[in-house]
């Protein structure tokens, strides 16, 4: 499959960080984050354990491996070949474990760009996930949604995250650059924060209303949308030091998610959308 030159900075960055990616996200905050993510995703798992699922922009395979462990035939795909190497290493470890070895045969690992999924069959998947803001950081969010729509079976579910436009305003305020703030508010577009110019790529941010409108325009019905993380616990690790801190924070975050306007202060938005039957 031909590579899209516009996506090379994205690929370069993720190739470079692949080997240390899991360590970057190994702390109590990310455990909190991942529990919230899974709690929202879990109700949309296919009831049929033979249903095909895809982890799009899978990175090192965190969510795809959970799906595979649940028995689903799982396709892991990412723009970065180095990220897929990390997935394959984990699958190789699974082969040595009697309780997991049989599930490895249900895994497919294949490089692909989120805006070009021609390599995969139409109307084949019951569930596609795209965590890590794949829709935000790909070169064309609308095209990505169209590609996923083509891959999903009628009634299939796409669960994904995007960066929240409203939450990013504080970054531009802190920088004190009025021109940059105005450009961002008007476009919802910024650049990946990395010092290496060769690794800088566009990031598309969305308000709740904007992402709802885009998915509907691409033929999806919005089933559920939450803001996360509404509680900015990453800013103070002391919150995790008390007994049962994780469970308390999960309960509070979940309570806040029931208030639709709370999404305005969340760093990300997570949606479950359905392809019409």
Predicted region positions:
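Conserved class I S-adenosyl-L-methionine
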Residues: 1-48, 62, 66, 157-188
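A short SAM/SAH-binding and catalytic strip from SAM-dependent methyltransferases
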Residues: 126-140
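Acceptor-substrate binding/catalytic loop of class I
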Residues: 195-210
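Class I SAM-dependent methyltransferase SAM/SAH-binding core
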Residues: 54, 60-116
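A short acidic, Gly/Pro-enriched loop at the edge of an enzyme's catalytic core
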Residues: 115-127
């Amino acid at each position: 499959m031909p590579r899209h030159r516009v996506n090379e900075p994205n690929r370069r960055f993720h190739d470079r960080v692949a080997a240390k990616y899991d360590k970057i996200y190994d702390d109590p905050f990310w455990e909190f984050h991942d529990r919230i993510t899974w709690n929202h995703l879990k109700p949309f798992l296919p009831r049929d354990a033979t249903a095909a699922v895809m982890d799009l922009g899978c990175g090192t395979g965190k969510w795809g491996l959970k799906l595979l462990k649940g028995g689903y035939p799982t396709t892991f795909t990412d723009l970065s070949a180095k990220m897929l190497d990390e997935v394959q290493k984990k699958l190789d470890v699974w082969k040595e474990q009697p309780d997991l070895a049989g599930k490895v045969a249900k895994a497919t690992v294949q490089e692909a760009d989120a805006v070009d999924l021609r390599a995969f069959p139409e109307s084949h998947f019951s569930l596609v996930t795209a965590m890590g803001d794949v829709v935000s950081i790909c070169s064309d969010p609308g095209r990505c949604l169209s590609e996923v729509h083509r891959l999903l079976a009628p009634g299939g579910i796409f669960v994904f995250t995007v960066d929240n436009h409203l939450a990013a305003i504080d970054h531009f305020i802190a920088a004190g650059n009025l021109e940059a703030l105005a450009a961002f508010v008007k476009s919802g577009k910024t650049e990946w924060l990395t010092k290496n110019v060769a690794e800088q790529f566009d990031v598309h941010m969305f308000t709740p209303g904007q992402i709802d409108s885009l998915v509907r325009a691409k033929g999806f019905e919005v089933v559920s949308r939450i803001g996360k993380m509404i509680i900015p616990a990453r800013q103070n690790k002391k919150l995790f030091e008390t007994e049962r801190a994780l469970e308390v924070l999960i309960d509070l975050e979940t309570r806040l998610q029931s208030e639709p306007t709370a999404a305005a202060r969340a760093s990300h938005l997570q949606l479950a959308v359905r392809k019409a039957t």
